[in-house]
Regions:
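RNA pseudouridine synthases
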Residues: 1-194, 214-215, 287, 295-326
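Short coil/loop residues immediately preceding or within conserved phosphate-binding loops
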Residues: 2, 77, 127, 205-207, ...
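Short beta-strand segments
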Residues: 3, 182, 186, 206-208, ...
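Short coil-to-beta-strand transition motifs
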Residues: 37, 74-77, 200-208, 268-269, ...
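Pseudouridine synthase
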Residues: 100, 106-118, 149-152, 161-164, ...
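Short Gly/Pro-enriched turn/cap motifs at secondary-structure boundaries
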Residues: 134-135, 199-202, 263-266
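Beta-strand-rich ligand-recognition modules
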Residues: 207, 215-218, 225, 299
């Protein structure tokens, strides 16, 4: 079983692994990487063994899989709330318990819902499926940006890599941070087999700025600015400084999670805001100087109200249910 296609200009300049992931989002990343390592992926009849190799529009691509699947005709579980839509990208409010990319063929995810919402005739140039630019964990809620064109995807990936995109999060944590404002600078090492991340001097540089907004000693509401973008960064960094996220069953506090299990059924982490500076590339001119905020979800808002904490007006949205929160 194999398939070939001529790459369009939407793919020009993209990393091989990311291009394959966007065309075949239903394939596990491990399967894509294994095929590359084994030399089963070819570009113009040459084995492509480097995941980071840049592809060019017009190249002939050969892969050991079937043709990309058709986008589902209707949403499986409803639409994803849209915060903003332009010609280059779509900004959505990701609900909890939803993957960004499908983990199985035809699986439910943000991108498959976006495909269904836009329809097969929309969302960019022919042959390009709208693609998520960054990742949020399954149970993390909030702002997520989806590229609608290949040139926008490349430009956004560059902006994230160059740390031009500002990312602010809210979290409810166990305990109280030692300082009202602190920067956590602790390198992170990922164990892919165990799917865990830990602080290690052998890891990649990771920095998180943490500000305590409210606390009663037992729980605290914190705002986070991710200065880097590592896997599980916010969760591991907060656990590292003794303030694990409430509801986090991987890195959290077992006893606190047990006591709050009815109110915190997931790690209470929310991608609050995504912002872009002026001076972006012309492809992203619609995004220059813009900030996008997602309303605080019901589970986090309920705990804040119960503790008497005041949420700033610009991050609370009583009409959230009307926008499709699940």
């Amino acid at each position: 079983m194999s398939f070939s296609l001529r790459l369009s200009q939407d793919h020009d300049g993209r990393r091989l692994d990311r291009m394959l992931r966007s065309v075949w989002p239903e394939l596990p990343l491990s399967a894509i990487m294994r095929a590359i390592r084994k030399g089963e992926v070819r570009l113009d009849s040459t084995r492509a063994r480097e995941p980071g190799a840049r592809v060019r529009g017009g190249q002939e691509l050969w892969v050991p899989w079937e043709a990309p699947g058709e986008r589902p005709a209707v949403p499986r579980r409803g639409a994803v709330p849209i915060l903003w839509r332009g010609g280059c990208a779509l900004v959505v409010n990701k609900p909890a318990d939803l993957l960004v990319q499908p983990d199985v063929k035809d699986g439910d995810s943000v991108v498959t819902r976006v495909w269904s919402m836009l329809g097969t005739a929309e969302g960019g140039s022919p042959g390009f499926a709208p693609a998520a630019v960054h990742r949020l964990d399954r149970n993390t809620t909030g702002v997520l940006i989806v590229a609608l064109r290949g040139d926008a995807l490349r430009a956004l990936e560059d902006a994230f890599r160059e740390r031009l995109a500002g990312k602010r999060y809210l979290a409810i944590v166990v305990g109280r941070p030692s300082r009202e404002l602190e920067e956590i600078d602790a390198p992170l090492l990922k164990d892919s087999e165990a799917n865990v991340v830990r602080v290690s001097p052998e890891g990649k540089s990771a920095r998180t700025r943490c500000r305590c907004l409210a606390s009663d000693g037992g729980l605290s509401l914190v705002e986070l600015e991710l200065l880097t973008g590592r896997t599980h960064q916010a969760r591991v960094h907060l656990a590292h400084v003794g303030c694990p996220i409430l509801g986090d069953r991987k890195y959290g506090d077992f006893e606190a999670n047990r006591l709050w299990r009815a109110a915190a059924r997931r790690p209470l982490l929310h991608a609050l805001e995504l912002s872009f500076p002026d001076g972006l590339s012309p492809v992203l001119r619609e995004l220059a100087g813009r900030s996008f905020r997602a309303p605080v979800p019901k589970d986090m808002r309920a705990i804040a109200v119960d503790r008497g904490w005041t949420l700033p007006a610009d991050i609370s949205c009583p009409g959230e249910d009307e926008d499709g929160d699940e």
